[in-house]
From Swiss-Prot:
PROSITE patterns in the cross-refs: ATP_GRASP
UniProt organism field: Haemophilus influenzae (strain ATCC 51907 / DSM 11121 / KW20 / Rd)
HAMAP family, A to Z: RimK
GO cellular component: cytoplasm
Entry binding sites for Mg(2+) 2: E267, N269
Binding-site residues, Mn(2+) 2: E267, N269
Protein name, entry field: Probable alpha-L-glutamate ligase
Binding residues annotated for Mn(2+) 1, in chain numbering: D255, E267
Amino acid sequence: MKLLMLCREPRLYSCQRLKEAAKHQGHEMDILDPNHCFLKLSQNPPHFQIFYQENSESKPYLLSDYDAVLPRFGTTSTQMGCSVLQHFEGKGTFCLNSSQAFLNARDKWKSLQLLLKAGIPVPNSLLSGGEVQAQATIPHISSPTILKTLNGSQGIGVILAEKPQSAVSIMEAFKQTNISMLQQDFIEEAGNADIRCFVIGDQVVATMQRIGQNGEFRANCHRGGKTEKITLSDEEKQIAIQATKAIGLDVAGVDLIRSKKGLLVLEVNASPGLEMIEKTSGIDIAAEIIDYIEINAFINSR
């Protein structure tokens, strides 16, 4: 197969592992930056054309057809990356994950709405309009409170407000910059630990526990969190699979937290990193992803 990965940083561990796995299984993979693409719609066939310009000095060229596309772009490239995905979808190419699912996952509030609508437990959460006074929301959420920007990743834009007035001050400061924030209950009993599940299709292929270090409440590996192996029950795995399906994703990193009320879904990541979970679990996740693409790209082509 001829595969395309949409990625701005081809040297990243995850991108290199996926390219190695594809090559090992006899496939060719190109890695291209979606921000170097331009898209053309035409009434005459071919209706969907994608051109690529390597740099400001080079001449754009028309991209050839691919059997499958893997989106691995970050939050700053979501809009253009998903537009490129939509163009490939228009051409009938199998995309892992779809553009709509990617957009769902990148919007934290919409993700929570979709999860709760599907009956999946999430922390109590609030989102308020720009004209709502921050003080008015305080009685409706726990203290301490977690504050999150709507489009952050890797723990960036996540703040713990220890006291109600601290939450008010932080929200009012962000409001001045037109950045919306959601509020969530702080799950104190979980301490500084959460669980990452790697879901492919209808299977949890790997899990790990992440533990924040040196008083850091965020357990994200990018924030220095320590990882260790963890075994989940079938019921807990099923929640991760259901969360992935609720967002519409084929492949996802699902973040879970154990609370007094049971397991809660914190977030569903459309482009989860491979490095720490592969090293912690010892599982070749990259090969599992390529296997999934082989099957589904073939089904899509029939």
